[in-house]
């Protein structure tokens, strides 16, 4: 499927086809398959540090992105970082009968719901203290370049049954996706949610929250600030615990390198339309670690489409994307040799 085995095999097929035609690859390539991206890549940095001499290269090619608007080849030049937190609020020593204790005893679901509701102010800005430290406003030349892409915000939201943009007031969805940080509850649990009804005050409630980071935001500093904020917003007799999951900073590529322009021309030739430099709302930690540990930029290109259903049942990858993606990588390899 598109995220990401299909894309990996597209690159591998390009290498196989090149060798079948030319006898050897056009450059000294190291193929590196990293399978922990969805969990924050906890083993990646130690591995890169331990094998830096073997892995260091002029440039990394990463095949984990998609087409822009399903038709325009795109090279991703910036990625958001990621911070994942799990918080649990505990109250009574056991579940309580809501008729006997309701109104007198603390309800952890109410406490946690208030914390989650308070993550944003009325304008949509995140309220975690210091959250926007290191967040830069979008340069005007980049804003103009993105505007020239003519992204259809209404169609983007309409495709998933929505009409009104969320996020910070006054910012378009494309800006929110590519250049602004977010805080999003991803799941909440507590009490009884099974068949029928049980009138309980739960002993505990928990939630999973992810933060997408941009610019120079510090994941660890935000983690600590978030935890301090939660502790300050719960009642004195509530016990709060946290589990930290993945954490990785945002990353930006140096597009002044000749490799980026060479790849852009190669993709334009294959797809018959001008390739675009774009941002990405997603997080691919390995790109940032290639830069910080190995000192090399990453050229990110991919052939996924909006209807591929990433992270959903029946996720797919178009045959056209496989065939044209294979030829695209072959063109990029030829342009970079």
For the regions a protein language model found, what residue spans apply to each?
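A generic structural motif
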Residues: 2, 93, 211-218, 248
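Acidic/histidine-rich catalytic neighborhood of metal-dependent amide-processing enzymes
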Residues: 4-78
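Acidic-enriched catalytic cores of C-N bond-cleaving enzymes acting on peptides and small amides
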Residues: 68, 77, 98-188, 217-239
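Short beta-strand/turn micro-motifs at beta-sheet edges
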Residues: 73-77, 194-199
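Flexible glycine/proline-rich, aromatic-decorated loop/lid segments
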Residues: 74-90, 299-304
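Zn-dependent metallopeptidase/amidohydrolase metal-coordination segment
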Residues: 88, 112, 186, 201-205, ...
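Short, solvent-exposed beta-strand/turn "edge" segments of beta-rich domains on protein surfaces
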Residues: 104-105, 195-203
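A short beta-alpha structural unit
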Residues: 211-214, 241-256
């Amino acid at each position: 499927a598109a995220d990401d085995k299909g894309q990996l095999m597209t690159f591998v097929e390009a290498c196989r086809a090149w060798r079948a035609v030319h006898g050897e690859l056009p450059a000294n390539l190291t193929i590196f398959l990293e399978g922990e991206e969805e969990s924050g890549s906890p083993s990646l940095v130690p591995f890169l540090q331990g094998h830096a001499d073997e892995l260091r290269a002029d440039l990394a090619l990463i095949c984990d992105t998609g087409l822009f608007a399903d038709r325009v080849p795109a090279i991703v030049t910036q990625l958001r970082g990621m911070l994942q937190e799990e918080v649990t609020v505990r109250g009574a020593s056991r579940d309580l009968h809501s008729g006997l204790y309701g109104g007198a005893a603390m309800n952890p679901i109410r406490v946690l719901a208030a914390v989650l509701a308070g993550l944003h102010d009325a304008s949509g800005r995140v309220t975690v203290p210091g959250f926007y430290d290191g967040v830069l406003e979008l340069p005007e030349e980049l804003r103009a370049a993105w505007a020239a892409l003519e992204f259809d915000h209404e169609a983007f939201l309409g495709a998933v049954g929505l009409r009104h943009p969320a996020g910070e007031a006054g910012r378009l969805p494309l800006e929110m996706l590519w250049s602004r940080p977010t805080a999003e509850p991803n799941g909440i649990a507590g009490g009884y949610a099974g068949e029928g009804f049980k009138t309980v005050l739960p002993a505990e409630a928990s939630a999973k929250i992810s933060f997408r980071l941009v610019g120079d935001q510090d994941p660890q500093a935000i983690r600590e600030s978030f935890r301090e904020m939660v502790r300050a917003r719960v009642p004195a007799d509530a016990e709060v615990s946290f589990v930290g999951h993945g954490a990785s900073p945002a990353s930006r590529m140096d597009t002044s390198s000749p490799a980026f322009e060479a790849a852009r021309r190669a993709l334009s030739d294959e797809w018959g339309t001008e390739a675009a430099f774009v941002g990405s709302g997603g997080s691919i930690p390995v790109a940032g670690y290639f830069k910080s540990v190995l000192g090399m930029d990453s050229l990110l290109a991919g052939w996924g489409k909006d209807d591929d259903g990433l992270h959903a049942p029946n996720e797919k990858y178009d045959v056209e994307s496989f065939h044209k993606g294979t030829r695209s990588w072959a063109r990029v390899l030829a342009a970079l040799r």
